[in-house]
Amino acid sequence: MESHCKWVLIIGIWALVADAAVNDTASLRQHRYDYGPFNGSLELATDVITSDTKRGEGSAVQLPHEPHLIRSSVIFGLTKVANESNVSPSCHNHLKLVQRGVLSKQPWAIKVLDASGTKPSGFVFGQNYWLGSREACHGVQRPVGITLSRHYERVMHYSILTQSAPFEMDYRVIYLRHRSPWQVEIKVMSEQVLHIGLCLPSSCGSEEVKQLTRDYVADSSFAEDDIFDMKPEVLYMKDLQLSANFFQRLTFRLVVAAILVTGALMVCAQQLRVVKGADDPDQGLAPVESELWQAMDSLLKREPVQKFVSCFDLANNWKKIAAMRPNQPGEIPIMNGLRSVCAIWILTFHVMWYMYFTVHNKTLLLSYAEQLFFQYVSTAPLLVDVFFTISGFLQTYNFLRNTKQLEAVRLNGLWGNVKLFGKLLFHRYLRLGPLYLVVMGSVDLAFAYIGDVSVFHINERFDELCPQYWWRNVLFIQNLFDHQEMCANWSWSLACDMQFFLLANIVLFIYAKQPKLAKGLTLSGLVATITWSYGIGITSKFEFSFDSTYLTGTQIYTSPFVRVLPYIVGAIAAWFFQEKGFQLEMSERRTRRYWHLSLKVFVGCIYATVKRDLGTLITISLFVLGRGLFSLTVCWMIVGSAAGTGVWWSRLLEAKFFQHLNRLSYAIYLLNPLVIALVYSLTNTSSAADPFLLSVVCCGFSIIVYLASIAFSLAFELPYSNLSSLLLKGKPKTS
């Protein structure tokens, strides 16, 4: 019994000791996280602010750090200039609560201050993104979802995770144009626009905040204006909310309708395939009780409708895209590789180009582009001439090989040739138009979306340009106008290609009847484009610098009168190859030398712009003659491949894989700027131009664009190509 009492006594003593230890630990833990009002409830925070308010609304007492905050923090400066005459009572009250919360170091108010933008370093080289943190502003409104153990000592105020603002806050961005002489002005797009992110009370309207900002920058309180002579001017403000008008846009309805109609046709094509593969084809498409399917069944029993619907057969179209077969006689396999590689190459350039409006070291980005190592990226626009050369070659080559059509042109009268010309134009438009128009509608929607929700100032507002100038794109004449007024301005080359197609067909029709006249017109066109290029280049003082290239874009870069040169060179090469029976009669060793020489000239033309301040005459000479030489090297590759010769690198370009990629090249060309611009604009922070990171980003964009191109090609390109073949030959074109 005594032993039992002894053990009870010992256990009781240990329990008391343990309880004391727990209390001490809890007390210590509470001490570690106890920072007076900082860790109190929201009511306590509000009480502190209220008591501070009662100490005097107009008190002249100023804390030591208050002048610094006024001049360095835009959000704090706005709280100081706010009064009852320039903002609503609720906005005024909430801004003053923010001000006093910052001065009394309330955690929620410090988070507001921290989430709002201030000037970062790098202004001289283009850092205009004072965005603060959108996520941190959201953290002011609601506790951050993170679990931290209290068993470890921390120096932080624990309530910065838990304490919320006593009223609604939201993140907005205000845009100011500056005129500072202390920032490198490149004159490529609109770079002198400050982006200032502000975590503001929701009670403050955008117009009120804009007026407060005007008062703040005009009051000499903006320290950065004193240092960098910014002379800021308020442009506009975004609340980063999607406009209610977005879903009312005509393009939204048209794109949705196109998707629904295409989807319905694909479903019908699939049902048709199932019925044809069934044991009893007369069974029909659907159960008897479904009136909709019965109506569809009766409609699809008509042979013309079946042929039309079969153009949208997803399985067949995928087989055509993915097919990789042996090269057929008369085909020129190197064209697949040239188109595919150049499409990805141009995509790489667009990654850099559309990075420009989100990068905060623009000067260094262009500096990298001028370095020798990165010339292959910065001169990628020259590769558009590869497509023009191939188009000119194929247009002439196919026309001259089609003896039946050639004879028809010779025998037809004027009206007969006009009808034939219209037929060719219709089929060209049918193959190119649907995907192009859907992408154009998608561009309008995408830029309307990012114009509302992106933190970045979007220089090229295609959602404003497309509703005004859509008809130019529909007619493929957008490149005849100012390049800054284009809807989807990267489509200028598609307009050029359509215009060259029309002109080439006119000359070829003339050639069928009067060969000498057609040859004279072709040579005259060649001389005219060279003369025009020299004249316009000298007049506009053209240089290879990026600012000069951008500002002379309408006169030179997108002008069909300048860009027609490689198309003519390709057409002449095709005429020599087809009509003159041009053959490569030389030794294998010499043939290899010419192949390698063509590659060296090709690369040399790419790197010819490494020095960009050579003077106008030398620059325009390099531009014109270099492009002519560049096109000749492409023609050599095409003719050499058609003749069956080649070397190791040309055999790589003739690989079967490029057949697949070539079928997607049109979609890749149309989609890559849209995808790249959309992804960049939806980020919440600016990025730095870093060569290694850029290479990784290029790989990522290549995969995304490739997958998007498959989807768009299956839906909006291949079905209409099948339809064109159906109308021409009576059945869809097979692989």
Regions from the language model: what does each represent?
Residues 265, 393-401, 439, 443, ...:
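Hydrophobic transmembrane alpha-helices
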Residues 563, 567, 571-573, 594-718:
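Alpha-helical transmembrane segments of multi-pass integral membrane proteins
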Residues 2-337, 342, 349-384, 388, ...:
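Exoplasmic/lumenal regions adjacent to the first transmembrane segment
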Residues 192, 240-257, 297-303, 330-336, ...:
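Interfacial loop-to-helix transition and helix-capping segments at the boundaries
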Residues 312-319, 654-657, 685, 690-695, ...:
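Membrane-proximal cytoplasmic C-terminal regulatory module of class A 7TM GPCRs
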Residues 252-262, 335-342, 381-384, 388-390, ...:
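Transmembrane alpha-helical segments and their boundary/interface "anchor" motifs
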Residues 254-270, 444, 525-537, 597-611, ...:
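Hydrophobic core of alpha-helical transmembrane segments in multi-pass integral membrane proteins
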